[in-house]
Amino acid sequence: DHQIPSEEFDVKGVLSAKAARIVPKALYVARVTRYDILWTVNMLAREVTRWSAACDRRLHRLICYMHQTSEHAQINFVGDAPSECWLTLFSDASFAGDLRDSKSTSGGILCLVGPNTYVPICWICKKQGAVSHSTAEAEVISLDAGVRLEGLPALSLWSLVIDVFEPEAKPKQPKLELSLHERLLLRRQAHDIFGSVDFVPPSLPICYGRGKLFILEDNDSVIKMIVKGRSPNLRHVGRTHRVDLDWLFERINNDPACFVKWVGTKEQLGDILTK
């Protein structure tokens, strides 16, 4: 964007009439397989109703990049049992990356990892709704979105997969007895989703405890805030950011299946989804 002449942002683009047909196709590709172009496509999608000559230049660059990398393939491999695999969430953020309103961008990618397994499952790229005061605040918001929208739902599903396909390895756990109404509701939901209710047990464990979620963050300050919780020194943190921080502290520290670890910037896979 810094290399695009400023006057092009105020001139209507040549492709303004076709942008609404081109961008959704690129967005579909980015959501299904090409997570490396998701940030660019999201940026173009926000400009569909106000398409400018600068957007023409961005779209041309995107099409050229996709053409040059059309023969590249994503290599995935699975060689382990479900109980031997774990989930890894890479979370990152670009501080004040938007030139118009100085808002940051959240990015994250969730992978299934094992000794002989590596499969990217889903990814997210989202512009934050509030302006952050620092990189740490922006990454807290990104981490909250990744854990809430990707990490925890996938952890629940993967724990269920392990229990269904490897029931003989299931450890003994305390049971939570359900009422008749709760059992009927679970069976109805299972029938709607899977078309069968055979796998629904008469009682559910309090927590499966076999699936694990490793959250990888490249900012030491964010990790310390999550592990120690919010302190009075963070008085400048806004209400929304404060709720996100408290929720992460409570969720990660009280859940034995969630772990936060540091990862180097070069190994941070979520970086490509933020810029």
Residue ranges of predicted features:
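RNase H-like nuclease fold core
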Residues: 86-136, 243
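Secondary-structure capping and boundary motifs in well-ordered enzyme cores
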Residues: 14-19, 33, 51-54, 82-83, ...
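Short, conserved catalytic/metal-binding micro-motifs enriched in Asp/Glu and His
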Residues: 34, 40, 107-110, 270-274
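Structured nucleic-acid-interacting core domains from mobile-element enzymes and related host factors
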Residues: 64-94, 194-205, 209
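RNase H-like nuclease module associated with reverse transcription
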Residues: 47-50, 129-275
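Generic recognition of flexible, low-complexity loop/linker segments
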Residues: 15, 26-27, 74-78, 95-99, ...
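C-terminal reverse transcriptase regions that engage the nucleic-acid substrate
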Residues: 1-74, 264
